[in-house]
Amino acid sequence: GSEMCIRDSTNGIVTVNGHSYEGAEKQTENTNFALLVAKHFSEPFKDSNGYGESIARLSNMLGGGVIVQRFGDLMRGRRSTEKRIEEGLVKPTLAATPGDLSLVLPKRILDGIIEMIYALDKIAPGTANDDTLLYGVEVKFYNMEVEIDNNLETRYKGLYIIGDGSGVTHSLSHASASGVYVARKIIEEM
């Protein structure tokens, strides 16, 4: 089981994150996962981190911090209430303000999250249950991408950039996989 937690950014913005625990004493009945929707902007827009920060600030303004919403309420176009959350099957693991994430998240991002919840429901039935709790927002701030080729190699022969520092990967599993990939490429070239 796992639980949600609060994360403060360096700019005083409160966002959400999750933890999974190995020890039985800290486990809950819940499972948590993040649904991250990447947005790649075209010219002339250049401040994707500022865009993400403004979404997080809006969430903080509307909810005084992290917002929680039942999936069923989101799909019915209504704000969640403490009463509906308390009556639900899923017990919250984070003190958050019941609210309406559709007032915070841009439509394309919200549509991507909803689409993914329904896709997950096909392989993990119950994911799209009315009582599923959505906490928001979680915003990832990524660095600029380093100029690399399809093999993660820079213009300097033999200099590879792997992991999240490359600006290409955005998770521990992707970062690890990029390291394995480059190691295999180097061995192959020996």
What is each of the regions a protein language model found here?
Residues 1-5:
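Short, small-residue-biased leader/transition segments that mark boundaries at the very start
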Residues 52-58, 165-167, 178-182:
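Short, low-complexity, polar/charged sequence segments that are solvent-exposed and flexible
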Residues 28, 45, 157-158, 165-169, ...:
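Glycine- and aromatic-enriched mobile tails/lids
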Residues 47-48, 171-174:
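Short acidic, glycine/serine/threonine-rich loops at helix termini
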Residues 7-107:
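C-terminal catalytic lobe of FAD-dependent flavoproteins
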Residues 96-169, 176:
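A glycine-rich dinucleotide-binding beta-alpha-beta segment and adjacent secondary-structure elements
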Residues 175-190:
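Internal hydrophobic alpha-helix adjacent to the cofactor/substrate pocket in enzyme cavities
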